[in-house]
Amino acid sequence: MALGILGRKVGMTQIFSPEGLAIPVTVVQAGPCTVTQIKTQATDGYNAVQLGYWPTAEKHLTRAQRGHLSKAGVTELLRHLREFRVDQPEAYQLGQKITVEIFSPGQLLDVAGTSIGRGFAGYQKRHHFGRGPMSHGSKNHRRPGSVGAGTTPGRVFPGLRMAGRMGGCRVTIRKLQLVQVDPERNLLIIKGSVPGVEGGLLEITPAKQVGNKR
């Protein structure tokens, strides 16, 4: 487990490789983040480092949040706090700055954020159901079809895919390639798209191995 960083999505653009290939990329303004808490196996039962990001006004923080930052000796007011599991928490100190220099070009990243909310959506848009016939007297155009059996079980099973609120949930896109790092402007240039709207908060971590290696 390795430390990540917090950032905000700036937008998408494209860059060109030395071979002349156009690469779609997302620009992320990441960090600098401040270490606001260090958790160890002895004190909390697990090892983790909490990072604070995005300076803000005092009115946007509760008294508990301001007290938490003051206890850590952090003078600036930070709006977003996130925790990252690490193997060696003793390698970090309270108030330490974490920048984009912890990453290197070519590295694979996992990027998590809140997906764009689409509001109430139907079966086709939300779950990609096929539609019914559009002519010959059909009245089943965009309906879901059967939602279960009859008297037995006499109910609709939980988890059945139906119309409802789409988007606005936490999404992680795995193994995105880091193309460039700009330490002077705190920018990460990531190949492909990342979740969320422009300006949305992102959690960026080194890619994790999920499942068994083949």
UniProtKB/Swiss-Prot annotation:
Cysteines paired by S-S bonds: none
Which InterPro entries does the protein's record reference? Answer: Ribosomal_uL3, Ribosomal_uL3_bac/org-type, Ribosomal_uL3_CS, Transl_B-barrel_sf
Self-association state and partner proteins as the record states: Part of the 50S ribosomal subunit. Forms a cluster with proteins L14 and L19.
Q: What is the lineage of its organism?
A: Bacteria, Bacillati, Cyanobacteriota, Cyanophyceae, Synechococcales
Annotated Gene Ontology cellular component terms: cytosolic large ribosomal subunit
For the region Disordered, what residue ranges are annotated? 129-155
Organism from which the protein derives: Synechococcus sp. (strain JA-3-3Ab)
Q: Name one GO molecular function term.
A: rRNA binding
Keywords associated with the record: Ribonucleoprotein, Ribosomal protein, RNA-binding, rRNA-binding
What's the name of the protein?
Answer: Large ribosomal subunit protein uL3
Return the Gene3D superfamilies for the record.
3.30.160.810, Translation factors
UniProt lists the family membership as follows: Belongs to the universal ribosomal protein uL3 family.
